[in-house]
Amino acid sequence: MNRSSYSSQSDNRYSRNPAVLCSFYSKIGACRHGEKCSKKHLKPISSRTILLANLYQNPTLNDDDYGHANGIGSETSQIIDNESVIKNSDTVGTVSQIDDSPHSNSGEVTKDETVETQEVETENSENIAETGDVKIDHNEDQKQIEDVKESDKVESSEEVQQDDKLHKEDTLEKESEDNIKQDENIEDAKLEDTEKDKLPEFTISQSQKDFDQFFQDIFVHISKLGQIRDIAVCENENNHLAGNVYVMFESAEDAYNANLQLNQEWYNGKPVYSDLSPVNDFNDACCEEYRDYHDCQRGAMCNYMHVRLPSSDIEESLYESQAKSYMLKQLEELKKELPGDIRSSSSTNDDETNGNENGISSTMAVLEQLS
């Protein structure tokens, strides 16, 4: 192999196109395809935002008390086979055979003629009688066959009528059952309508109270680990965003420490899964349609955050109390950094009613540092 060809292959090896980053993961910190995504999910090493996956349990998705499934009963159809039994009677007719026996022509023709004629006449009369009997028997057999057929027809017609009656009764029973089911469904629908008319006020207010309590719990606890800048709680219906809680801190150091601590904790009987998130701006990650109208036509197919907000008074009180607590912490830290004489003068001035110039100057210095 030539050195030039080897160098060209090495150049081609290192000049491959870089992996394409997943825009949804970079912008929202979650992707519908997860690890199976064809694009690159670049996890940040340092970030001000952490993701608490599926921490919020949305009652509208998990509680089945307010949803009634319309069950469709399976109807079994029965098919009745009508079989008509036809009796075939085989009649055996009698066949008469007439044997003509030859007579010897002797010299006594005149004597035997009368006897023969009489015998022939008697035989003919007997044969005629036998044929008459045969005809009569044959006619009687035909009549019997016809009678049997007619009786079979009558029986078959009666069976068909009975089957028709049974079928009609079955259809009537099915129709009555269907009518009963329809009436029950109508009653259930009416009950659902009345329940829906009664439930929304309760469910909306109760769910908002529950969410406010949840928001307050996580805000108070996480604010002890670092100063919170913003929180976004997702109420999406898809799996990769449902219940996700995004917490943005004032500093990346606070986010890093909070991430380590939260991964060791439990909430509501379940372990907390925390991770650094690449989300830098919640406004870009939020669904504008859901934010403006609290509704999204894409529903579960939407890959942007459907953020649920707490009550305004609770949110304001939480952020105000956090700001106050961190201001007091900063004051304590500043007091530790002040020189000894200023600290002693500030302590004595707190006891005095009128105060002096040293105390005023120390407080002014603290306020300037805070600003």
Swiss-Prot record:
SMART domains: RRM_1, ZnF_C3H1. Disulfide bonds: none annotated. Keywords: Cell adhesion, Metal-binding, Nucleus, Repeat, Transcription, Transcription regulation, Zinc, Zinc-finger. A zinc finger (C3H1-type) spans 16-44, 281-309. Residues 192-279 form the RRM domain. Residues 115-124 have a biased composition (Acidic residues). Induction: Expression is induced in biofilm. GO terms for biological process: cell adhesion; mRNA splicing, via spliceosome; positive regulation of cell adhesion involved in single-species biofilm formation; positive regulation of cell-substrate adhesion; regulation of transcription by RNA polymerase II; single-species biofilm formation on inanimate substrate. It is found in: Nucleus. GO terms for cellular component: spliceosomal complex; U2AF complex. Residues 132-194 have a biased composition (Basic and acidic residues). GO terms for molecular function: pre-mRNA 3'-splice site binding; zinc ion binding. Disruption phenotype: Decreases cell adherence to silicone substrate. PANTHER family: U2 SNRNP AUXILIARY FACTOR, SMALL SUBUNIT. Transcription factor required for yeast cell adherence to silicone substrate. This is Transcriptional regulator of yeast form adherence 2. The lineage of its organism: Eukaryota, Fungi, Dikarya, Ascomycota, Saccharomycotina. The gene is TRY2.
